[in-house]
């Protein structure tokens, strides 16, 4: 009964917490924290179940010990034992009453409460999509920050607070996720890591023959026919009855025979070409991939000494706003052209926590606008959850909005709502423009406020590693610092887009990244930021 009450309490409390959470937990660390508490309560429920089972087992053990002692005496001299009428009565009673009662005790199912709890909460657990998304996130971090599988498996990441290692089965899960998505490059890397840990003697449920089955086909898909044959033969030495491996080996060997039939020169050239490109990370659609990722690693930043001399710090009072004359903000130049500045102590810790508190229940997978259709959709290159806050939601929202207006000298009347974003595992937003380009579907037409003239980005958390805001065309990288904000203009004074402001949010390697954005629009800024005398002013 006690267990049933506990289960009911657990169900009521966590049903309320998780019922509003959508799938795609991996896209928001904020939502994943709820899973920690859900798992903690499941452990408590499981411990209660174990206590009940142990108490039941203790009774059964006590009964068994007592019966063993009794039957050893009675079986030694059955007639003499039964000569005593009390013994005869007790034997009948035991077999008619006590043993059936013991049977009922054994048949009692103490797991019902725990199973009921697990079944209800399971509706809100991560899905296969979450697991594959989390696997992709780890591989994204692996590629962006040039981490080898062994480093990730040992959990040797910069800025980590807790030790975390990947088991053999964990590594196999990563390799299998890559395989299921046709990503044979990462399949090979992680299946090789599985073999390495198996050879080191680690325990696992996965078998070496299963790993070789995946690995041999993956290297074949990457064009390494000789190694595919070698691995398949190794698989068959472990499991001679493996039908698919036998068929694959015959197929691979036939392809090798066909290769040998080619001219020696062609074969040599082809072999060299294959080896040169073997196991290379596949190319994708993003032209500035190398530049973007090197900036994320802190490499390739083009902040030369000459440029650095142009950067200064100062106290900023806006356009002599009375509030800022009394308490100006510290302003630091991050880049000279286009001018990107950072402001310090823009939001207090209390304001940040309050905004996160009211934003969290509204978080939903962040979307992007399809440039062809103008329709909002989710995309693999933007991994985060976001919500939009109105001033009516809480006084702190109105207060922060006014502060951004004072700092920038721009009106927030035509600005978008305050967007709060929380990045998940490997959370990122690949290179993009904040403004709508002339060849795009007019993304802001329905707002009637013109294009996005400026971006005000608040950092609401520190990030232990990764998570920089980078500008690939500039070679600039800006690192998150809690309570600070960066600001830049997306449009030139002529109203044309400043294409140098193409930027990205790097994947979060370690930590939890919270930001909030305010996008100012053109309407209402005509006299606050008037046109210049030239097109590029």
From Swiss-Prot:
Binds 1 Fe(2+) ion per subunit. The gene is P4ha2. Fe cation binds at residues 432, 434, 503. It is found in: Endoplasmic reticulum lumen. Its cofactor is Fe(2+); L-ascorbate. InterPro entries: Oxoglu/Fe-dep_dioxygenase_dom, P4HA-like, Pro_4_hyd_alph, Pro_4_hyd_alph_FE2OG_OXY, Pro_4_hyd_alph_N, TPR-like_helical_dom_sf, TPR_rpt. GO terms for cellular component: endoplasmic reticulum lumen; procollagen-proline 4-dioxygenase complex. Keywords: Dioxygenase, Endoplasmic reticulum, Glycoprotein, Iron, Metal-binding, Oxidoreductase, Signal, TPR repeat, Vitamin C. TPR repeats lie at residues 209-242. Gene3D superfamilies: 6.10.140.1460, q2cbj1_9rhob like domain, Tetratricopeptide repeat domain. Belongs to the P4HA family. Its EC number is 1.14.11.2. Expressed at least in brain, heart and lung. One of its GO terms (molecular function) is iron ion binding. Glycans are attached at residues 117, 266. This is Prolyl 4-hydroxylase subunit alpha-2. Pfam families: 2OG-FeII_Oxy_3, P4Ha_N, TPR_P4H. Heterotetramer of two alpha-2 chains and two beta chains (P4HB) (the beta chain is the multi-functional PDI), where P4HB plays the role of a structural subunit; this tetramer catalyzes the formation of 4-hydroxyproline in collagen. The modification N6-succinyllysine is found at residue 482. 2-oxoglutarate binds at residue 513. Inhibited by poly(L-proline) only at very high concentrations. Residues 414-522 form the Fe2OG dioxygenase domain. It catalyses: L-prolyl-[collagen] + 2-oxoglutarate + O2 = trans-4-hydroxy-L-prolyl-[collagen] + succinate + CO2. Catalyzes the post-translational formation of 4-hydroxyproline in -Xaa-Pro-Gly- sequences in collagens and other proteins. It comes from the Eukaryota. Residues 1-23 form the signal peptide.
């Amino acid at each position: 009964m006690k267990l049933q009450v506990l289960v009911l309490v657990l169900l009521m409390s966590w049903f309320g917490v998780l019922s509003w959470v959508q799938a795609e937990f991996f896209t928001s660390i904020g939502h994943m924290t709820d899973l920690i508490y859900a798992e903690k309560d499941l452990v408590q429920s499981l411990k209660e179940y174990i206590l009940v089972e142990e108490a039941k087992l203790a009774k059964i053990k006590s009964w068994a010990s007592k019966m063993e002692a009794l039957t050893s005496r009675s079986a030694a001299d059955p007639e003499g034992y039964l000569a005593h009428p009390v013994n005869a009565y007790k034997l009948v009673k035991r077999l008619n009453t006590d043993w059936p009662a013991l049977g009922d005790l054994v048949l009692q199912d103490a797991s019902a409460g725990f199973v009921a709890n697990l079944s209800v909460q399971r509706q809100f657990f991560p899905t296969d999509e979450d697991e594959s998304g989390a696997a992709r996130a780890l591989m994204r971090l692996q590629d962006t920050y040039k981490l080898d599988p062994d480093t990730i498996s040992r959990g040797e990441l910069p800025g980590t607070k807790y030790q975390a290692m990947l088991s053999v089965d964990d590594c196999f899960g990563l390799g299998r996720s890559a395989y299921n998505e046709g990503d044979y490059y990462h399949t090979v890397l992680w299946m090789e890591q599985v073999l390495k840990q198996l050879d080191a003697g680690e325990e696992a449920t996965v078998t070496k023959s299963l790993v070789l089955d995946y690995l041999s086909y993956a290297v074949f898909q990457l064009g390494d026919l000789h190694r595919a044959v070698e691995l398949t033969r190794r698989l068959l030495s472990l499991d001679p009855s493996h039908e698919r491996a036998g068929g694959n080996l015959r197929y691979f060997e036939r392809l090798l025979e066909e290769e040998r039939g080619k001219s020696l020169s062609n074969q040599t050239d082809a072999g060299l070409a294959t080896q040169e490109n073997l196991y290379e990370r596949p190319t994708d659609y993003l032209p500035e991939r190398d530049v973007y990722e090197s900036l994320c690693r802190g490499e390739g930043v083009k902040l030369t000494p000459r440029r650095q001399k142009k950067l200064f710090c100062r106290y900023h009072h806006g356009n002599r706003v009375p509030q800022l004359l009394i308490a100006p903000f510290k302003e630091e130049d991050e880049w000279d052209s286009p001018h990107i500045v950072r402001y310090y102590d823009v939001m207090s810790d209390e304001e940040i926590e309050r905004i996160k508190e009211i934003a969290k229940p509204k978080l939903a997978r962040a979307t992007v606008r399809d440039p062809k259709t103008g329709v909002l959709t989710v995309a693999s290159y933007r991994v985060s959850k976001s919500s939009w806050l109105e001033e009516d939601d809480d006084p702190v929202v109105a207060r922060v909005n006014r502060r951004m207006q004072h700092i920038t000298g721009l009106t927030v009347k035509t600005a978008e709502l305050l967007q709060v974003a929380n990045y998940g595992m490997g959370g990122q937003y690949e290179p993009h423009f904040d403004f709508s380009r002339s060849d795009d579907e007019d993304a802001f037409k329905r707002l009637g406020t013109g294009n996005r003239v400026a971006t005000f980005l608040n950092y609401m958390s520190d990030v232990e590693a990764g998570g920089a805001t980078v500008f690939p065309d500039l070679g600039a990288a800006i690192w998150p610092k809690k309570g600070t904000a960066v600001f830049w203009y997306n449009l030139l004074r002529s109203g044309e887009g400043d294409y140098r402001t193409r930027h990205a949010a790097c994947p979060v390697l370690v930590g939890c990244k919270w930001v909030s954005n305010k996008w100012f629009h053109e309407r209402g800024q005509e006299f606050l930021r008037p046109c210049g005398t030239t097109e590029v002013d």
